[in-house]
Structures are given as structure tokens and as C-alpha cells.
Amino acid sequence: MPNTHDTKNNVSPSEYAKFDPSTIHQRLNTSLSRPQLNSDGSIRHFLGVEGLNKAQLQAIIAKALFFEPSTRTRTTFEVAEKRLGANVLNLDIASSSAKKGESLRDTLWNLQAMTADIFVVRHSASGAAHFMATEVTPDIAIINGGDGWHAHPTQGMLDMLTIHREAPRPFEELSVAIIGDVKHSRVARSDISALQTLGVKDIRVIAPRTLLPKGIERFGVQVYEDMNSCVRDCDVIMGLRIQNERIGSPLLASSSEYYKQYGITPERVALAKPDALIMHPGPMNRGVEIASSVADGPQSVILKQVSNGVAIRMAVLALTMEGQRAHQANRG
């Protein structure tokens, strides 16, 4: 999906040229499998769900289900790392030296001096994790903790785990409605890609036109104009947060008008299937994106999404560690 986000403050000019916003998503989605996988198909870096096939996504879910009984705390990579005994460095580049003008490559070289096996990277520039995976030394693996508008693959996979565990029907039989700020949401991109890979054929999206990427129909989703029609007979209703911090100018008339047109209300939930799941990646804007009675209601699995996050992150860390060992064995 096109990305017009200005990322020049986060990478050097030469690096930025490699990630032209007009082509970033198409280019990344067609190339992610190359640095992401070893020759045997094991995961070398976890950069996005787009580069993985159905069996590989199912393997992540299966690994997460193995870890699930021990996950009772809030979703953080730190919890997962401690339970696995992994030597992991968590990086929020936006709050590091990049703010002072240091290039992404220089940041990476400095970080490599710290003895860590895996870097979990969050960056405001689309493609940053992909860039680091191509530049990092062979003994370090990269996990994408969210890059710009491009992808949030661990959130996407914890959403798939939640649907797998809670939905009464298999992926192939589900209708999923995604509501809200798709344009600025890396979660939406990862969810749409994962849902399609796992066999969901009916993916619906609705938002004000200002919050939809241009040409979104090309990505195999149905765009709706009417909220009631969008959620009717759905199995999963997924709200998205309005990304105010990524919106350069006002794109909404008002919060109250947005809620009136696109809010997930009890009346609209009643139009979906009786056992429909209510999801949201958080944080929620109650009374804008979703009614409190829905967020806290019996069909909501929002807190289960949170608790499933630890299992997914443990699964991703474990599979990445296995892939890293395989990569090192092949080199040796």
C-alpha cells in the first residue's frame, strides 16, 4: 500500500533513496522472503508476514499454542525473552541517536558492538527493519517490532492466534471487517496479509476516504461505504486506532462525527453474527472508535489479544533463534 510518510528524519539520504515511499510496500512485500528466510525455509529474520507462506504462519501459531499455558502477564518482548533466556536488545530507534541525526547504518554499526543475538527493532521509517536485516552481521537476527506504516508482524500474528483460538469457524470460512485508520496503520497491513495467507476470502474495510490508502482495492479487500452493511453477518469486527500522531493535518471533521459514522456500537455489533469477535490492537479511543459497552462486553477478545502477545513473541523469538542456529550451522 502506498506510503507518503516522510521518513527522511530517521534515515540518511542515501538510505532513504532505497525506500521510496511510492513503492516501499510493493517492493518490500515482494522481497521480504529473501533476507527473512534461510535456504531451508527456517526464519532467519522476522520482518513481516508478507514474506511467509501459510505453513510458516501456521508454524508460528502452533509454536505460540505450545507456549500459551505459561503466558499470564502483559504482552512484552521482555517477558518472552526472560522466559526463553534469550540475549535480545530492544531498540526504539525514534528515541535513540537517530533523533540527533545519526544515520540508520551508523546506529546499526554502533549497536552491533553490544553483544546480543537478536535485535527487536521499532522504527518510524517504513523498511527500516528490512534495511537492518540486509546490513547486519551474520550472527545477529532482526525482529521487526513495527516499522513506519509498513508492518507490525508480531501484532498481526497475535491477532491471528486470537482468531484461531476464539473463532468458532476456520479461517477459510470467516468474514472479517476492519474499521478505522487503515491508511496509517501498520497493524492493518500485517493483519490483511496474514488473513489472506491463512485463507480468509471475505475481508471488508471501511473508513473515511481520507483514512484509506489509494488503490486499497488492489489488495484483495472489499471497501464499504456504509458501516451497517460492512459489519452485517461478520465473524470478526476489528477496530483500528486513529493514528493522530501520524496524521500531518486534520483528516476528520470531529470525533463525534466519526463515532456516529464508524463507531463500533452495540447496535452495529448486533448486525454481525451472534458469536462475532470484537478486536482492537489498542490503545482504544473509547467513545470514538468503540463503545465502552462493546469493548468490555462478552464478545470482546481485546484482553485476550494482549495476553496472547507473550505467546506469539515467545514463538517468534524461539523460531528466530532456531533459524539463527541453522544459519550459523550452514555457514560453518
Curated annotation (Swiss-Prot):
Q: Does the keyword Chloroplast apply?
A: no
Record has Transmembrane helix as a keyword: no
| Catalytic reaction annotation | carbamoyl phosphate + L-aspartate = N-carbamoyl-L-aspartate + phosphate + H(+)
- Provide one Gene Ontology biological process annotation: 'de novo' UMP biosynthetic process
This protein's UniProt keywords:
Pyrimidine biosynthesis, Transferase
InterPro entries for the chain: Asp/Orn_carbamoyltranf_P-bd (IPR006132), Asp/Orn_carbamoylTrfase (IPR006130), Asp/Orn_carbamoylTrfase_sf (IPR036901), Asp_carbamoyltransf (IPR002082), Asp_carbamoyltransf_Asp/Orn-bd (IPR006131)
**Gene3D superfamilies (alphabetical):** Aspartate/ornithine carbamoyltransferase
**Superkingdom in the source lineage:** Bacteria
Q: Which positions are annotated as binding L-aspartate?
A: K100, R186, R241
Q: Where carbamoyl phosphate is bound, by residue? A: R72, T73, R122, H152, Q155, G282, P283
Q: In which pathway does it act?
A: Pyrimidine metabolism; UMP biosynthesis via de novo pathway; (S)-dihydroorotate from bicarbonate: step 2/3
Which GO molecular-function terms appear in the entry?
amino acid binding; aspartate carbamoyltransferase activity
Cleaved signal peptide residues? none
**What GO CC terms are in its UniProt record?**
cytosol
**EC annotation from Swiss-Prot or TrEMBL:** 2.1.3.2
Q: Where is this region: Disordered?
A: 1-20
| Record-stated family | Belongs to the aspartate/ornithine carbamoyltransferase superfamily. ATCase family.
What is this protein for, i.e. what is its function?
Answer: Catalyzes the condensation of carbamoyl phosphate and aspartate to form carbamoyl aspartate and inorganic phosphate, the committed step in the de novo pyrimidine nucleotide biosynthesis pathway.
Q: Which NCBIfam families match?
A: asp_carb_tr, PRK00856.1
Q: How does it assemble?
A: Heterododecamer (2C3:3R2) of six catalytic PyrB chains organized as two trimers (C3), and six regulatory PyrI chains organized as three dimers (R2).
Name by which UniProt lists this protein:
Aspartate carbamoyltransferase catalytic subunit
Organism whose genome encodes this protein: Psychrobacter sp. (strain TAD1)
Gene field:
pyrB
